[in-house]
């Protein structure tokens, strides 16, 4: 789930050329069908310049391999997609293929109303389950109101990890070593503050940096061996958000906000603008996701790592998963249209598409082909290694807002109150849990 919206990610020209060149080379065998004089309406959320360049080239390649087919592309921000997708499909004038946010509020609601078609047939036909693990595909499964089981309604092209961005030059200038444990991170923040350096870049006016910070800190304190409780929450099996760990995470973030650990004026800065400030050299750390790799690579001093875990946590979890899923809507009325949509999605999650994304500096969910030799940025190299480790350790965590249709709004409404000290950490977590318990009650 890509949580970023408005800003444009400007890639260096040579990276855009590399991405386009690799995408152009991707005209290989990907199940070509007979030519069909047809249009395919597609909505995606790749609004960043670097992302959009890759999608545009991939679309051109698909059209070239399918004479007569025209991709009618509409790019929408994450927030716009949430507002308009379900209504557009319901009204009959939306996309045939779309990106859709996983979780109860979007994919779950659309499945419930019959607005999305299962893609299990295409998983089997194209072998998508060989490209991505079952635990990743489970994030696109719904059976009635049950999340994580049943039929599969989508598949994603990009992987996502929420982690710790750091500016190595700022740390070196302040005499601060890269933290290896959570206690070392806390000590580093104190030292940076003493030196007059903003420890964290933050922007809370728009987007969801604070949400990711709270979730990432909490899940870094969970060992993968003990992940069942979190899984149950996200997949609607029950439990409570009102835990000591969630309260402590909210308390720590509130203390940072109140204690001068965030960039001055963060309350009036959007998340995307905060990222641009960080790229320009403001702030030592920033907690967010790999979807900013395309922007972050413009500053060679910026690195990326997992949130340092406390002692005793051997396989810490990281918030993350995959970006919005490619899905087929109910507007694919006949089998020919459905099969064309399935072919399109197959190409978007193919090894060649993964190679194009990697060349542009983004983290693909599908493994790169064995003979691929893209020039990987240091950030992407770090991201790929983290992705491998998290999957090997079964330590890929969850976005908290996936747990109910209204959880994102509940968190967004209460986060400014938490950061400003107008509500306690206990009240913040209680609001999340009340939302969740109401959802569980409505499901019955």
Enumerate the language-model features and the residues they cover.
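Conserved N-terminal structural module of periplasmic/extracytoplasmic solute-binding proteins
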Residues: 23-24, 35-115, 124-131, 178, ...
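Short, solvent-exposed loop/beta-turn-alpha elements that line the ligand-binding surface or hinge
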Residues: 120-135, 220-248, 298, 309-318, ...
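C-terminal capping/gating helix-and-loop segments adjacent to ligand/active sites or protein-protein/ligand interfaces
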Residues: 363-370, 383-437
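Extracytoplasmic/periplasmic substrate-binding proteins
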Residues: 45, 212, 217-222, 248-337
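Extracytoplasmic/periplasmic substrate-recognition and gating elements
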Residues: 60, 64, 91, 150, ...
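Hinge/lid segment of periplasmic solute-binding proteins
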Residues: 104-162, 212-213, 304-305
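Glycine-centered hinge/linker elements that transmit conformational signals in sensory
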Residues: 189-192, 232-266
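Extracytoplasmic/periplasmic solute-binding protein
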Residues: 144-157, 162, 186-238
